């Protein structure tokens, strides 16, 4: 008896797509996906090939400190997405089941992000922070400056990982301005 065993990798081999500029962010970017989006306007004005990878409702840092790295929705935070760019594996993002309103574009966006040839990306815009603020994400940890479950720790971790993997990449953070909430 001859047994033939086929191994299927968890992630299909995709044709990598080159982009000059990638945008990550929350609903400010994610909910506007047409020719009026910031990514589309930048592409129109500069001729750079831009991709809008914004996902509404997401955060910069990881969200569930109780579960730590076992919470799959954390993989769509900016920190989680950057980790996937660096290791070139979007397998965990494909396991996330989002059932909230206005997320019908998530599956396509996450699939597209997994195909981007990040070695070709020149500029990464990360626009995030309001959801971190409103969800009560701590500003930073005194014991771990790279704690991705804090806002500043996530920024430090993102910059460190990207600098090590893509030293020529320009990283631009667009964070919310100071606002007084009552």
Enumerate the language-model features and the residues they cover.
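Conserved SGNH/GDSL esterase-like catalytic core that processes O-acyl groups on lipids
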Residues: 28-141, 145
């Amino acid at each position: 008896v001859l047994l033939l065993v086929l191994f299927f990798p968890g992630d299909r081999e995709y044709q990598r797509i080159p982009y000059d500029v990638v945008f990550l962010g929350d609903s400010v970017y994610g909910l506007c996906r047409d020719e009026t989006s910031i990514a589309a306007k930048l592409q129109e004005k500069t001729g750079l090939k831009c991709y809008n990878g914004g996902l509404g409702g997401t955060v910069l840092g990881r969200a569930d400190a109780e579960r730590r790295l076992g919470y799959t929705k954390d993989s769509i935070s900016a920190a989680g997405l950057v980790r996937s760019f660096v290791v070139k594996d979007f397998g965990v993002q494909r396991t996330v089941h989002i059932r909230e309103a206005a997320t019908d574009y998530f599956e396509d966006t996450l699939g597209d992000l997994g195909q981007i040839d990040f070695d070709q990306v020149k500029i990464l815009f990360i626009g995030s922070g309001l959801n971190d603020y409103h969800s009560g994400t701590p500003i930073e940890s005194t014991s771990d400056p790279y704690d991705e479950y804090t806002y500043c720790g996530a920024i430090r971790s993102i910059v460190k990982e990207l600098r090590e993997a893509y030293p020529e990449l320009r990283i631009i953070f667009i964070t919310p301005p100071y606002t007084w909430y009552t």
